[in-house]
């Protein structure tokens, strides 16, 4: 599969994997192996640098790209502070910005996200912001230096699929300067395949893998779905037609 480039790094997988709801950290190595993913997201609040046993980083291969997120931040200032803590803790300079002040629907605050992104880009971070799929805000994020834009497919953790499909289509069509990574709400492999067929550059999956009866097998299923969806997009899917179109001649073969 063709490579994806973010922040100057080339990736041979277009599936990003989250760790937020896994029953045990011990399953992480197997999930990452079967998913073929090269990018793993971790909530900074789960990184315990004082403990060798409970620190989630101990279960993550050093060859993977660690993408800490600012989960728990309610405004730009808190997100910036969390990003700096992550970098100081040795988590690198990649950061996924999550700014959520809405405790009911957990929808991202685009305004505060843009502020945090602009500040952190100036500090040398590779910033991947999680946002509501709004074209104007996506353009603002590109203008302030975001390395990718990560619009939600549905409310985080809902497993409801691509409920924002029409808005995602607009972003995918109009945002060409940086990758569009569909994040949140993807509930099954077919959702991931659909996002890739639409032209998304990558998808991030967490809850759908973590809450499956067999997370390792589900990770492999998502890997295959992302590959299939990307291949279909590159191959150029045939146009839909309102009426039937015969695949073989209907006349002349009995004469």
Curated annotation (Swiss-Prot):
SUPFAM superfamilies: ThiG-like. It catalyses: [ThiS sulfur-carrier protein]-C-terminal-Gly-aminoethanethioate + 2-iminoacetate + 1-deoxy-D-xylulose 5-phosphate = [ThiS sulfur-carrier protein]-C-terminal Gly-Gly + 2-[(2R,5Z)-2-carboxy-4-methylthiazol-5(2H)-ylidene]ethyl phosphate + 2 H2O + H(+). It is found in: Cytoplasm. 1-deoxy-D-xylulose 5-phosphate binds at residues 157, 184-185, 206-207. The active site is at 96 (schiff-base intermediate with dxp). It is an enzyme of class 2 (transferase). Gene3D superfamilies: Aldolase class I. GO terms for cellular component: cytoplasm. One of its GO terms (molecular function) is thiazole synthase activity. Its EC number is 2.8.1.10. Its main location: cytoplasm. Keywords: Cytoplasm, Schiff base, Thiamine biosynthesis, Transferase. The keyword Transferase applies. Pfam families: ThiG. The keyword Transferase applies. GO terms for biological process: thiamine diphosphate biosynthetic process. Pathway: Cofactor biosynthesis; thiamine diphosphate biosynthesis. Homotetramer. Forms heterodimers with either ThiH or ThiS. Catalyzes the rearrangement of 1-deoxy-D-xylulose 5-phosphate (DXP) to produce the thiazole phosphate moiety of thiamine. Sulfur is provided by the thiocarboxylate moiety of the carrier protein ThiS. In vitro, sulfur can be provided by H(2)S. Belongs to the ThiG family. This is Thiazole synthase. It comes from Clostridium acetobutylicum (strain ATCC 824 / DSM 792 / JCM 1419 / IAM 19013 / LMG 5710 / NBRC 13948 / NRRL B-527 / VKM B-1787 / 2291 / W). The gene is thiG.
